[in-house]
């Protein structure tokens, strides 16, 4: 039996909707990264963008275990001497763009190359419950019910 290698004609992209409310951030990011890569498909081909389009809603209500909400830091550098800056996860989640926490978590689980950048364009994250992709008729994936460890109440 020959090894199957997908061609662009074989790729069929679906739309998947995930509600992040109460879901643990790392577990959500792992599931989303695998869907974006296409590793959940039997026709997975490593060098092609096989993954589905993923819509994440309620990103501002994502949970973190332990003290990560207060202790986890997101660093950047201004380019000037002594210009290292940081914000905690709590500051980002309570700020103007809380969806960036989810985007960063998924981005850091995807390959850091041109294919990874292409796969990240298939991710849409929204802080609230509304999204403009109803016309695509996304199928709902309930991450919270996949494993009891995927949720955290407090």
Swiss-Prot record:
Family per similarity comment: Belongs to the universal ribosomal protein uL13 family.
A UniProt-annotated Pfam family: Ribosomal_L13
NCBIfam families linked to this entry: rplM_bact
Keywords noted in UniProt: Ribonucleoprotein, Ribosomal protein
Protein name, entry field: Large ribosomal subunit protein uL13
GO BP term (any one): translation
Keyword DNA-binding: no
Gene: rplM
SUPFAM superfamilies linked to this entry: Ribosomal protein L13
Molecular function, one GO term: mRNA binding
Organism: Cereibacter sphaeroides (strain ATCC 17025 / ATH 2.4.3) (Rhodobacter sphaeroides)
Assembly with partners or alone: Part of the 50S ribosomal subunit.
Function description: This protein is one of the early assembly proteins of the 50S ribosomal subunit, although it is not seen to bind rRNA by itself. It is important during the early stages of 50S assembly.
GO cellular component, one term: cytosolic large ribosomal subunit
InterPro entries named among the record's database cross-references: Ribosomal_uL13, Ribosomal_uL13_bac-type, Ribosomal_uL13_sf
Annotated coiled-coil segments of the chain: none
